[in-house]
Amino acid sequence: MKTSLFKSLYFQVLTAIAIGILLGHFYPEIGEQMKPLGDGFVKLIKMIIAPVIFCTVVTGIAGMESMKAVGRTGAVALLYFEIVSTIALIIGLIIVNVVQPGAGMNVDPATLDAKAVAVYADQAKDQGIVAFIMDVIPASVIGAFASGNILQVLLFAVLFGFALHRLGSKGQLIFNVIESFSQVIFGIINMIMRLAPIGAFGAMAFTIGKYGVGTLVQLGQLIICFYITCILFVVLVLGSIAKATGFSIFKFIRYIREELLIVLGTSSSESALPRMLDKMEKLGCRKSVVGLVIPTGYSFNLDGTSIYLTMAAVFIAQATNSQMDIVHQITLLIVLLLSSKGAAGVTGSGFIVLAATLSAVGHLPVAGLALILGIDRFMSEARALTNLVGNGVATIVVAKWVKELDHKKLDDALNNRAPDGKTHELSS
């Protein structure tokens, strides 16, 4: 039985985004006041991210026959992340050099308002490699859950899963309790997702109301260039990877269409994380693979953010007439290979990493961030959408490599078929 169009989450979120854009454009003051609706929805999602990751990873690892399989999955995932994110960085670098959206602007860095980006520059000072690694280790277990730090929760969940697995039959009771708790958490997610249209409406109304459509026109060449690059990356790079793995990127995008709309409305790929964990498992990827790849990907496999970082850095160099020869660009690439891994899937994190990168490279003016401060919020949608698709594709690829992918389940889900061969409407 097909779900009514008006009852589908896809239609509701799309309608809410459209209404939010109209309200923000025609009544900007009212639109700005809608910010709490978007913030509230994202906070509700963040509230359950830590327990979702913990339950998924622990039950996935504890339920595996061999611990070697977990190590193999992690190694394959990290290798994939490094290769694909490097490709994303290089593509961004090539496109921005060909199009040169900042050429001819002739901006004097001394005339830019450095105070506007001072907060980001200060936060960027703590983005070093050692600081990043140390930040993965929580000061306390409770602190990891309280702060919602994905990597800290993931580290504890992996250790807990290993320890529970070693207990064998003695740990069965704990395993059953965590599985039951997981079902309760996903029940909460279903309730929260009913508020997705309200959250998307509030976030979009605020964005358009505060920054205005005029901001899109100003510096529009960079925005258009970035969006086209992200689309090309998804279609050509991720599309080729998907084809080699045995599925269609377009069918996969259709499968996660509701999650993409939620991300479009909130500009944060993190807002779709809980549902992605569930959907990737339903797609045929083993729970242990999903639990490791998706959360880790939110720090190590942000393809959209990688494209953004190279394009934004070179754009600032072009606009301020700063020297960017081949040596400088290779240096930039090497720095970004490290600094880009510190960007979480939340709004604004890419901007902080960009500030850290400009500081590390040295010869690029950090004050140049002021050039893109006004349009960064509009570029975050493309970043978040590309990040989400990239992590979804990564999960399927890794699951296939480690032989933990149910190909029939994948084919049935992407072709909208029930196990008996009958078509059905994807659940929302």
From Swiss-Prot:
Keyword check for Nucleotide-binding: no
InterPro entries: C4_dicarb_transport, Na-dicarboxylate_symporter, Na-dicarboxylate_symporter_CS, Na:dicarbo_symporter_sf
Record GO biological process: L-aspartate transmembrane transport
TM regions (residue ranges): 5-27, 47-64, 77-99, 141-163, 184-206, 219-241, 326-348, 352-374
Keyword Cell membrane: yes
Keywords on record: Cell inner membrane, Cell membrane, Membrane, Symport, Transmembrane, Transmembrane helix, Transport
HAMAP family: C4_dicarb_transport
Function statement: Responsible for the aerobic transport of the dicarboxylates fumarate and malate and to a lesser extent succinate, from the periplasm across the inner membrane.
Protein name, per record: Aerobic C4-dicarboxylate transport protein
